[in-house]
Amino acid sequence: MSLTRVSVTAVRNLHPVTLSPSPRINILYGDNGSGKTSVLEAIHLLGLARSFRSARLQPVIQYEEAACTVFGQVMLANGIASNLGISRERQGEFTIRIDGQNARSAAQLAETLPLQLINPDSFRLLEGAPKIRRQFLDWGVFHVEPRFLPVWQRLQKALRQRNSWLRHGKLDPASQAAWDRELSLASDEIDAYRRSYIQALKPVFEETLAELVSLDDLTLSYYRGWDKDRDLLEVLASSLLRDQQMGHTQAGPQRADLRIRLSGHNAAEILSRGQQKLVVCALRIAQGHLINRAKRGQCVYLVDDLPSELDEQHRMALCRLLEDLGCQVFITCVDPQLLKDGWRTDTPVSMFHVEHGKVSQTTTIGSEA
């Protein structure tokens, strides 16, 4: 799975551009502020209908433009080309088109174009709140387990109903009990999917991490969000008074976490910045391997400022792991010479120079393996 064409209009400082990227390695280089990251942001918009740089749309849409648009052609795993398009307006409205038809939700984009982002904010996967790690976990489950999304939607609906009742007390006891049962059933299914995914992820992550850095005492564990020895219905009943006082449900899969520890301590508090980056890269590369194994296509990787925080040895190791995935990768850097020895001679590599928002292809080397 790869993008064969990307057209971008009115995204930040970028001039209108149509790119024909390599199916493997694509390097965007140029000075800081030239627009390299904006190209990755445009691809991210195409795959997820949102920016990774801003929760607000206004900074993403070019000044004096009403909307930004990104179109792409994706070569699917079955060899069929799929056309994607998204237009986002300043007011927040968006239109998604897949093969000429309006799409109902961004989930359809995500399913068609699985994206993995590695950027300077990726440290938040280790340092940030549990919500970030849940999103990482659920992204992986979504892409390997087709039954996950409808169950997750059931869970969200039941959770909204229960939290509304906790705040306003407008449900009769029978309705309350019914929503608690629905919440418990959906939670058990979500927990089972997540647990199965972690069991598959751990050995792949450990093997991938060993290729990047020696951290033998680093462990990955899963907390499901409530006592592992108690049924969620029982926990909900026993915590009802406290939940009413807090105004929301305290236990359940919405409180799950992926715990990453080194010698029993929070890894984020011990690891250097470079080590943290390598751990995050290993996690995201491991997810790519699982998608490949599940025959659900391949990820497209967006790697912003790959050389930062890494010495030459670790840069080369990361390049080789990305190359061995056999998928499409978009990498930004200031100095492309730092990456020139990272690829095998037969790997297709396209180079794009970005200057003052203008993107131009400079070199294509290698041939498709």
Swiss-Prot record:
GO terms for molecular function: ATP binding; single-stranded DNA binding. ATP binds at residues 30-37. GO terms for cellular component: cytoplasm. Its main location: cytoplasm. It is found in: Cytoplasm. PROSITE patterns: RECF_1 (PS00617), RECF_2 (PS00618). Keywords: ATP-binding, Cytoplasm, DNA damage, DNA repair, DNA replication, DNA-binding, Nucleotide-binding, SOS response. One of its GO terms (biological process) is SOS response. SUPFAM superfamilies: P-loop containing nucleoside triphosphate hydrolases. InterPro entries: DNA-binding_RecF, DNA-binding_RecF_CS, P-loop_NTPase, RecF/RecN/SMC_N, RecF_2. The keyword Aminoacyl-tRNA synthetase does not apply. The RecF protein is involved in DNA metabolism; it is required for DNA replication and normal SOS inducibility. RecF binds preferentially to single-stranded, linear DNA. It also seems to bind ATP. Belongs to the RecF family. HAMAP family: RecF (MF_00365). This is DNA replication and repair protein RecF. It comes from Pseudomonas aeruginosa (strain LESB58).
